[in-house]
Amino acid sequence: MSESVRTNTSIWSKGMLSVIVAQFLSAFGDNALLFATLALLKAQFYPDWSQPVLQMVFVGAYILFAPFVGQIADSFAKGRVMMVANGLKLAGAAGICLGVNPFVGYTLVGIGAAAYSPAKYGILGELTTGDKLVKANGLMEASTIAAILLGSVAGGVLADWHVIAALVACALAYAGAVAANLFIPKLVAARPGQSWRLSAMTRSFFCACVVLWRNGETRFSLVGTGLFWGAGVTLRFLLVLWVPVALGITDNATPTYLNAMVAVGIVVGAGAAAKLVTLETVSRCMPAGILIGVVVAIFSLQHALLPAYALLLLIGMLGGFFVVPLNALLQERGKKSVGAGNAIAVQNLGENSAMLLMLGLYSLAVLVGVPAVAIGIGFGVLFALAIAALWIWQRRQASY
């Protein structure tokens, strides 16, 4: 079975399509579950401060399990790892449905998500190679963003109708993802026979961090993707603060619609990157990264809804064009040095650490009373400067 997969590297192979379907259902469940669980917290009269804590336990699972999930992904067939990880998500969602403390259930979902991520991206490099890997990443990102859009809306709409029905729908989505994983052919483990002692696994993970950081291309990818996803999460919270101030709109729906425009743009940008960027021309994505910051700063000055929608769509397009080639570069180079699973686990550690750091700085700015518009302008300028510095650094490294 594995041999047939290795010879059929088409991005439309049965194995690849199964991965994409499983990813869509799993990401759909993740996003629907967030809004359904938030509705449950409100219905059970949890305090307002508990809502960000729910996101923190999810992100915290990524950071806590980062030293171990990469080795797990590389030590077993990645399709089976994905199936078990989705099973953990299913157990967490089902537990919340049955009355388990929502923070406990959501933590279990976070552990499943942490284990799932290195396997889902690592398997792309085993099902296809070379320039097709960029296209496969584009498909993965497009399915993820589509799931984010549909899952977020479905979770909110169903929760308004019936909270338990929304939670059951999330569990069914995870069950569908488990079923889709069964159709992924069983591939040979990438790096079997590694030590399972916690000390050895931790040491191995941090050795992988060092190896990837010392390589100019993978260091470039790690920093770029970390900056992008950290900025993306911060922008989501910034919109909630910015909309009432800049647009005078106080409902809860408008920030959600604006976030949706970013997601739609990412799908378009990811598709463009798949056609226009190869592993040999990854640096083509860097101007898009700089422009993200520029457009965020311009967006922050808007006072009308239509230009805001258009600029956020553009931000998403630039973001998709920027991040997809960087993901593909890390998978290809990481697979050859530390294993794709370990490479993605290191990437997850960097991205989630960046999320916590940027959200912390954002919260500090809000706490000291910096206006929302000023935060947006400063955020955009700093992001553009950071990506420009990364590009200059990468070009200097390449010239040595």
From Swiss-Prot:
Membrane association type: Multi-pass membrane protein
CDD domains according to UniProt: MFS_MefA_like
GO molecular function: lysophospholipid:sodium symporter activity
CC annotations in GO: plasma membrane
Entry-linked InterPro entries: LysoPLipid__transptr_LplT, MFS, MFS_trans_sf
Superkingdom as given in the UniProt entry: Bacteria
Transmembrane segments: 19-39, 53-73, 91-111, 139-159, 164-184, 195-213, 227-247, 257-277, 281-301, 304-324, 352-372, 373-393
Subcellular location: Cell inner membrane
Keyword tags: Cell inner membrane, Cell membrane, Lipid transport, Membrane, Transmembrane, Transmembrane helix, Transport
Family: Belongs to the major facilitator superfamily. LplT (TC 2.A.1.42) family.
Protein role: Catalyzes the facilitated diffusion of 2-acyl-glycero-3-phosphoethanolamine (2-acyl-GPE) into the cell.
Protein name: Lysophospholipid transporter LplT
UniProt lineage: Bacteria, Pseudomonadati, Pseudomonadota, Gammaproteobacteria, Enterobacterales
